[in-house]
């Protein structure tokens, strides 16, 4: 285990990034008539890869303690955790969705860990990460030990189910509803998984990247404003 006072930047050699997409043109859009040169841009879209040991800071202690805690209940670490990522001095555990409640329970209840607070749930949509298009991210806080860890779960677009953490962290109630509302992730076991911001009869999930851009034509001094995906931008 590494020292809590150790600077993680001195201990980490980041693993290879995972390329999930290649984006061409300005904001990935084509056919805009742009003359600024941005249309020739080619960028790879990457996610941080698995980090090697030592992780640095208190991260090794958290991972080692969680490993022992899971094993005491017959759960192997590699079966529950897909990869460990340390990026920008933050620890993220990528969790298998079936193991999410077990991992969260151990992180909360083990006195050596005591991540007693979940700060929310965020959704992310990676449409080109085949089989892992939808991600749910849970930042956890240990008030007892002044530590943070992030849990991340990925599910396919065709089966967007994740076990709800409401029974373990009741504060996720509205956050899971919001993530369902905007991304379409279904949190199994949530007591009332309904929309929270969009109308109940709304079609689709507005923060997904495949959600169509909309626009209302507005007249301004005799001119019509085109929809957002047809406008030029020079800044």
From Swiss-Prot:
Compartments, as annotated in UniProt: Cell membrane
Source taxon at top rank: Bacteria
Pfam families per record: Complex1_30kDa
Cleaved signal peptide residues: none
Major localization class: membrane
Enzyme Commission number(s): 7.1.1.-
SUPFAM superfamilies reported in the protein's UniProt record: Nqo5-like
GO cellular component: plasma membrane
Gene3D superfamilies found in the cross-reference section: NADH:ubiquinone oxidoreductase, 30kDa subunit
Mode of membrane association: Peripheral membrane protein
InterPro entries linked to this entry: NADH_DH_suC (IPR010218), NADH_quin_OxRdtase_su_C/D-like (IPR037232), NADH_UbQ_OxRdtase_30kDa_su (IPR001268)
Keywords: Cell membrane, Membrane, NAD, Quinone, Translocase, Transport
Catalyzed reactions per annotation: a quinone + NADH + 5 H(+)(in) = a quinol + NAD(+) + 4 H(+)(out)
GO molecular function, one term: NADH dehydrogenase (ubiquinone) activity
Quaternary structure and interacting proteins, as annotated: NDH-1 is composed of 14 different subunits. Subunits NuoB, C, D, E, F, and G constitute the peripheral sector of the complex.
Protein function: NDH-1 shuttles electrons from NADH, via FMN and iron-sulfur (Fe-S) centers, to quinones in the respiratory chain. The immediate electron acceptor for the enzyme in this species is believed to be a menaquinone. Couples the redox reaction to proton translocation (for every two electrons transferred, four hydrogen ions are translocated across the cytoplasmic membrane), and thus conserves the redox energy in a proton gradient.
Similarity comment: Belongs to the complex I 30 kDa subunit family.
Name under which the protein is recorded: NADH-quinone oxidoreductase subunit C
Species lineage: Bacteria, Bacillati, Actinomycetota, Actinomycetes, Mycobacteriales
């Amino acid at each position: 285990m590494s020292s809590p006072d150790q600077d993680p930047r001195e201990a980490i050699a980041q693993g290879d990034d995972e390329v999930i997409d290649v984006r061409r043109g300005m904001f990935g859009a084509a056919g805009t008539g742009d003359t600024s040169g941005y249309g020739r841009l080619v960028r790879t879209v990457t996610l941080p890869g698995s980090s090697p040991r030592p992780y640095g800071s208190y991260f090794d202690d958290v991972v080692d303690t969680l490993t022992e805690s899971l094993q005491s209940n017959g759960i192997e670490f590699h079966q529950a955790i897909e990869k460990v990522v340390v990026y920008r001095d933050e620890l993220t555990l990528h969790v298998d969705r079936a193991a999410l409640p077990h991992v969260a329970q151990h992180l909360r209840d083990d006195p050596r860990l005591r991540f007693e607070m979940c700060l929310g749930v965020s959704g992310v949509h990676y449409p080109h990460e085949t089989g892992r298009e939808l991600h749910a991210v849970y930042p956890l806080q240990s008030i007892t030990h002044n530590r943070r860890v992030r849990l991340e779960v990925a599910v396919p677009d065709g089966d967007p189910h994740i076990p709800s953490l409401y029974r373990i962290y009741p504060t996720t109630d509205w956050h899971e509803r919001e993530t369902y509302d905007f991304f379409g992730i279904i949190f199994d076991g949530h007591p009332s998984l309904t929309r929270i911001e969009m109308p109940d009869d709304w079609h689709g999930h507005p923060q997904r990247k495949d959600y169509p851009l909309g626009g209302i034509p507005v007249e301004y001094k005799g001119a019509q404003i085109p929809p957002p995906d047809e406008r030029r931008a020079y800044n």
